[in-house]
Structures are given as C-alpha cells and as structure tokens.
C-alpha cells in the first residue's frame, strides 16, 4: 500500500487531486494537507490571501511545515501541488531530511510570471515536474514534462453555442475574496433584474463549504441566489458569469461561457505584486490565450475576456462588461484555447507516480 504525502492547499488543487485519485489504484493512501480522509489539515485552514495575512498566520504555517516534514518519514513519496510559498521550502526540508525521498510537483508555480529563479529550486529538490501548460517546459532544464491540463479531465460540459438560461456569480473561495466581491455581485444582480427582468441567479459555492453556515459567510443577501456546488454544470447553463480571479476563469473559458473577471486586493499587496509580476493580464484564460497567439503567426496581444481590477472594478464596470462583450468572438476564440490545451493530465501523472514508486 503506497503512502503519498500530499500538500494541496488550494481549492483548485483539490479538484485536480480528486480526478488524479480516480486514476490511481485503490490501495494508494494519502496523508498530509488535502480535502479528505486521513488529512493532517484541511485546505480551509490555509485560506490566506495577501502578504499581511501570511505574516499574521506565520506561527500556524511554521507549525504545519514542521509537522509535514515529520509526516514525510511515513510516506513512500511526496506530491506537491501549487502553493509554491509553502511547498518549495517544504520540498527543500524533506530532501534535506531524506535525499532519496521521491518528490513530484504537479501544478507548477508560475515562474513565467515572476520569480523565475524558482525553476532552479524546483529542479534541485524535485524528481518530476508536471507542467500543465505547453510553454512551461521551456523554463526548466530537464525534469519538466508537459502532462496536459487537468481541467480537461474534469470538465464534462462544453457549450455548443453561447445560449444560456442563468447568470452565474463566483466571488471566490477565500473568505477575504468573498467579503470584497459578493456585495458588488449582489448589486449587479439587483440592477440586472430591474433592467432586464428576473433571471435565475446562481451563486457557486466551493464544495468544501458544504455543512458550513453560508449565511454567516456571505450575509443575508445570499437568499437572493440559488446555491450550487457544481461550478462546471452551472457555467455550462449560464448566459454569462461574474467571476473572481482564479481557476474558475479558465474553467469558464474552456466550457465556453462568456464572463468578466473581477478582482480587488489590498492596496499594498497589489502594489507589491505589480512590481514583482511581469504580466499584462491576471486571468489565466487571458494569459494562456496570449501564449497561444504568440505561437500563431500574425496574431498580436489581445483580451479573450474583460478584466476589472482594483480601482477599475465597480458595479457600473461589471454591468458594462456584461452588456458590451462580443459573445460571438469570445465563443470562437474559447474553442481555439480549448484545442491549444488539448487533453487532461490525471492518467499521465498517475503513471509517473507509479514510475517514481518503482511499480512499473
């Protein structure tokens, strides 16, 4: 029975982990940080956003790090997913403790956006790097392989046209994101009802919020919405979506649902990020769409979808994005993006895990 130490702190990572688990033999056992049985911590306990939040919870993070390094002694291999600030130092400590321990990093840090030096650290401490974007491999020397994009394993619904019946609102998976985004989305929903009549309004809630008091998390206005825990099905049925920055933006693009990205960080966090990150866009769909255009002769930089960030984010701006978006162009270009990413990654990662464990 192989035991795998898992560090999956993000909601999206756990969604990818669930699909990976389906492709593994039943006797594989997970320990560590993830959503499920035998977890040392739930990802909810790492729901941190911004530089100040990290400082405020430094004691907890150091404690969790120490416990994970100890837990690695029980594991046959280590699987790290995303969350580089936590996982790269963890890989370093585990390799120092046991140089022969096999470490796989799946969902790589965005070294193409900032901190390119992290690529060297990953190759030094990890045995296999699973790249989910075709262009990522070029940032590494030898240990990275393109394995496909996990969302193409997980998404079962793809639009054949841009028709839809509902408006979908996705204010994020962190409490701090919800506090900033949800009040704006409530106002947008109310104004659209006044202007266009009633439309079904669906609030997509992260699956790991099941069993929690949603009214305490979102406030009294949650009663204005239908609740869904199935993001993909909700996006498939939607005419349009209002989405906080994150993996959900790429999900919407691959499904073919028109949307606007909304994001507002603490001013200091945003200024620091702007100095460090060398990107024109923050939405994954826009980033990957422009990577595709870079590889296509005659195409320059352009947006697949609108982004409203910091002081550009307002109720008026969200309404304007909804009204003015060229839905026909968006749908056509979203199909190009889907073809670019092509296939899923769970089976490939499962095979690589078996190889690292010497089971093949």
UniProtKB/Swiss-Prot annotation:
Q: What class of enzyme is it?
A: transferase
* A GO cellular component entry from the record: membrane
Q: Which NCBIfam families match?
A: lpxB
What keywords tag this UniProt record?
A: Glycosyltransferase, Lipid A biosynthesis, Lipid biosynthesis, Lipid metabolism, Transferase
Tell me the organism's taxonomic lineage: Bacteria, Pseudomonadati, Campylobacterota, Epsilonproteobacteria, Campylobacterales
Describe the task this protein carries out: Condensation of UDP-2,3-diacylglucosamine and 2,3-diacylglucosamine-1-phosphate to form lipid A disaccharide, a precursor of lipid A, a phosphorylated glycolipid that anchors the lipopolysaccharide to the outer membrane of the cell.
| Catalyzed reactions | a lipid X + a UDP-2-N,3-O-bis[(3R)-3-hydroxyacyl]-alpha-D-glucosamine = a lipid A disaccharide + UDP + H(+)
Keyword match Nucleotide-binding: no
User: HAMAP family in the record, alphabetically?
Assistant: LpxB
Enzyme Commission number: 2.4.1.182
GO BP of this protein: lipid A biosynthetic process
Report the family membership. Answer: Belongs to the LpxB family.
Q: Supply the PANTHER family for this chain.
A: LIPID-A-DISACCHARIDE SYNTHASE, LIPID-A-DISACCHARIDE SYNTHASE, MITOCHONDRIAL-RELATED
Give each disulfide bond as a residue pair.
none
Q: Please give the name of this protein.
A: Lipid-A-disaccharide synthase
Q: In which pathway does it act?
A: Bacterial outer membrane biogenesis; LPS lipid A biosynthesis
What does the record give under GO molecular function? lipid-A-disaccharide synthase activity; phospholipid binding
């Amino acid at each position: 029975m192989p035991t795998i130490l898992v560090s999956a702190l993000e909601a999206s990572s756990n969604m990818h982990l669930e699909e990976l688990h389906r492709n593994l033999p039943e006797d594989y056992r997970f320990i560590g940080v993830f959503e499920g049985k035998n977890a040392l911590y739930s990802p909810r306990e790492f729901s941190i956003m911004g530089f100040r939040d990290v400082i405020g919870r430094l004691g907890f993070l150091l404690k969790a790090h120490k416990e994970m390094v100890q837990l690695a002694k029980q594991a046959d291999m280590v699987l790290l997913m995303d969350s580089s600030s936590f996982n790269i130092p963890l890989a370093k400590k585990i390799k120092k403790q046991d140089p022969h321990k096999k470490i796989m990093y799946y969902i790589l840090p965005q070294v193409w956006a900032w901190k390119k030096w992290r690529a060297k650290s990953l190759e030094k401490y990890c045995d296999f790097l699973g790249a989910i974007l075709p262009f990522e491999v070029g940032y590494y020397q030898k240990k990275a392989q393109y394995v496909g994009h996990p969302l193409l394993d997980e998404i079962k619904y793809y639009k054949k046209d841009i028709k839809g019946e509902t408006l979908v609102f996705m204010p994020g998976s962190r409490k701090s994101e919800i506090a900033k985004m949800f009040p704006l989305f409530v106002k947008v929903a109310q104004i659209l009802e006044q202007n266009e009549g009633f439309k079904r309004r669906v609030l997509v809630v992260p699956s790991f919020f099941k069993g929690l008091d949603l009214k305490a998390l979102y406030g009294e206005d949650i009663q204005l919405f239908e609740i869904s825990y199935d993001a993909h099905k909700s996006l498939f049925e939607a005419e349009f979506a209002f989405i906080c920055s994150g993996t959900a933006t790429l999900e919407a693009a691959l499904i073919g649902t028109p949307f606007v990205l909304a994001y507002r960080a603490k001013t200091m966090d945003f200024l620091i990020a702007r100095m460090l990150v060398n990107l024109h866009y923050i939405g994954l769909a826009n980033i990957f769409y422009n990577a595709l255009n870079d590889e296509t002769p005659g195409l320059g930089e352009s947006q697949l979808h609108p982004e409203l960030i910091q002081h550009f984010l307002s109720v008026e701006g969200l309404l304007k994005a909804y009204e003015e978006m060229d839905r026909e162009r968006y749908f056509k270009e979203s199909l190009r993006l889907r073809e670019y990413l092509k296939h899923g990654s769970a089976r490939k990662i499962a095979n690589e895990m078996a190889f690292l464990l010497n089971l093949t």
